[in-house]
């Protein structure tokens, strides 16, 4: 475990890059770290090249980013954890777990292409998982000679954002070239600094739910020989300290109690983890097979596992990439809660024979495994790897 203390003097914000495959998300992430390391050198600001962000071996073989890369950097006023969210449609599931961790995001659109299918999909996902603030980076402007074409692409992006209830007319659009900035072109480096100034000012410092009871959705689990089991994820709300008693809730039949013996972030030890932090939690008396992704670590008795609830859902239209046909009573899709999919059956309200793509409806859901849910928990409805709806738990039934 890490020895160095983590510096809390600057406010911490989680952001990420989203957008269509090959539009330059990873190159922009590399450019931000590299330009900040040149302009604002510090122990945090270390340049990361494309290959190191695109690190997992299977990613390079296909030239597409699969896993979610985490990098950190700081501006004069803030510390950032940056997620490079995968752009390819096959990896939307990973995108959902990544986007759920963002206070705001940079939507990368290649000026040479304009908005593409995954641009739309990622805007929709951002809306669904509660990413409220988007900034647009129009990339590859060095490859477009026609000023009018750039204006058209910008208008198209703004219209698309408005369609999904983002303030398309007002949100910032920055035009630049991530590759040119990475290569050290001063003009394009300046634009990266302008982008970061915009991120500093436009994405509000998140309201942290530190006063609420602890809830940490488990993303990953590993064991450290001689120390015990570590669960990692982003603290949704509350705080966690060494010696805290916690419960591991969901999926398994029984809720398990445990004690926290260590908290760390970016390989540095913390006195406490706060809402919004990406942390690893060392747990005493928990075997590696007793905790898994999809469960939550919570303050004892603060949240319970449930299989039945009422939900308000919106079913995506065909144009939004949803189903082409209606569904009927006892439809069995996957319900995506926080970090995992669980199959469930849908019971429609009395008198409703079917639900059409584009409809809003109140449904009763019964899951095959209990999940830690409460009123206000959000979820996506998915089938065959694609999102077909989104919803929010309105009432717990059992």
Curated annotation (Swiss-Prot):
Residues reported in the UniProt entry to bind GTP: 19-26, 84-88, 139-142
Reaction catalyzed: GTP + H2O = GDP + phosphate + H(+)
UniProt region (G4), positions on chain: 139-142
Keywords associated with the record: Cytoplasm, Elongation factor, GTP-binding, Hydrolase, Magnesium, Metal-binding, Nucleotide-binding, Protein biosynthesis
Listed CDD domains: EF_Tu, EFTU_II, EFTU_III
A GO molecular-function annotation: GTP binding
Main location: cytoplasm
GO CC aspect terms: cytosol
Top-rank lineage group of the source organism: Bacteria
Region annotation G2: where it falls in the sequence: 63-67
Ribonucleoprotein keyword on record: no
Compartments in which it is found: Cytoplasm
InterPro entries: EF-Tu_GTP-bd, EF-Tu_GTPase, EFTu-like_2, EFTU_2, G_TR_CS, P-loop_NTPase, Small_GTP-bd, T_Tr_GTP-bd_dom
Top EC category: hydrolase
EC numbers on record: 3.6.5.3
Region span, G3: 84-87
Region (G1): 19-26
Record flagged with keyword Nucleotide-binding: yes
Entry binding sites for Mg(2+): 26
Region (G5): 177-179
Domain tr-type G residues, every copy: 10-207
UniProt similarity note: Belongs to the TRAFAC class translation factor GTPase superfamily. Classic translation factor GTPase family. EF-Tu/EF-1A subfamily.
Function: GTP hydrolase that promotes the GTP-dependent binding of aminoacyl-tRNA to the A-site of ribosomes during protein biosynthesis.
Subunit (UniProt): Monomer.
Protein known as: Elongation factor Tu
Organism in which the protein naturally occurs: Streptococcus pyogenes serotype M1
Lineage: Bacteria, Bacillati, Bacillota, Bacilli, Lactobacillales
